[in-house]
């Protein structure tokens, strides 16, 4: 088993995750992190909640952010407000020792005006539910033209909740020259159809191993 250092994780991030109790990489992290730290790499993974997938995509996304350029560089789509807040909280914890990195959770049921103000101040990573992000796009208060990485977390749940059209509209607004990361607990026909569009270099099946 490799260490986070051997996977290429930066000292600042390693310091933060060690304080969080991360001793060694989980299997999905060991597979995914090196790919995402490379260039032009897509990922499709069957990974249930509790496999460590948030760190698998979160650590390399954070490491690749140019904090001096306060524009959206990574987009994470997820099905619920609760997961949106959880992922954003984890990313803030991982980036504890990276000065100036800004993560914005975007979800329905909260003030859209405050989210618009935060976008105007500048953010690096957007964690969003599809419906609210599409609302912001229609208001022309968010630009996805600088996004380099798109993560679809719990993609099967998003499709089950009827977000297919919203996701398609969002992806159509993101540059084609991007990395796409799809994480799903199941391989439904719709997920299989989407995954075929992703020329993934890293595909894996990871079951629940920790909470």
Give the predicted meaning of each segment:
Residues 33-41, 54-69, 85-95, 134, ...:
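Walker A/P-loop NTP-binding motif
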Residues 37-38, 120, 199:
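Hydrophobic/aromatic position at a conserved helix-loop-beta junction
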Residues 47-51:
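The conserved Walker
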């Amino acid at each position: 088993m490799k260490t986070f250092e051997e996977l290429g994780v930066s000292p600042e991030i390693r310091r933060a995750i060690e304080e969080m109790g991360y001793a060694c990489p989980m299997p999905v992290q060991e597979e995914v992190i090196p790919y995402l730290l490379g260039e032009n790499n897509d990922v499709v993974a069957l990974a249930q909640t509790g496999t460590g997938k948030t760190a698998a995509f979160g650590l390399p996304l954070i490491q690749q952010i140019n904090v001096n350029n306060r524009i959206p560089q990574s987009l994470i789509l997820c099905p619920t407000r609760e997961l949106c807040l959880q992922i954003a909280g984890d990313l803030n914890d991982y980036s504890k020792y990276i000065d100036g990195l800004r993560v914005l959770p975007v979800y329905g049921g909260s003030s859209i005006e405050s989210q618009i103000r935060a976008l105007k101040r500048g953010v690096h990573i957007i964690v969003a539910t599809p419906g609210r992000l599409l609302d912001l796009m229609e208001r022309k208060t968010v630009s996805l033209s600088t996004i380099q990485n798109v993560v679809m977390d719990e993609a099967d749940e998003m499709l089950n909740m009827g977000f297919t059209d919203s996701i398609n509209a969002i992806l159509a607004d993101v540059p084609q020259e991007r990395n796409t990361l799809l994480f799903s607990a199941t391989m439904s026909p719709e997920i299989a159809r989407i995954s075929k569009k992703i020329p993934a270099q890293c595909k894996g099946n990871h079951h629940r191993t920790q909470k």
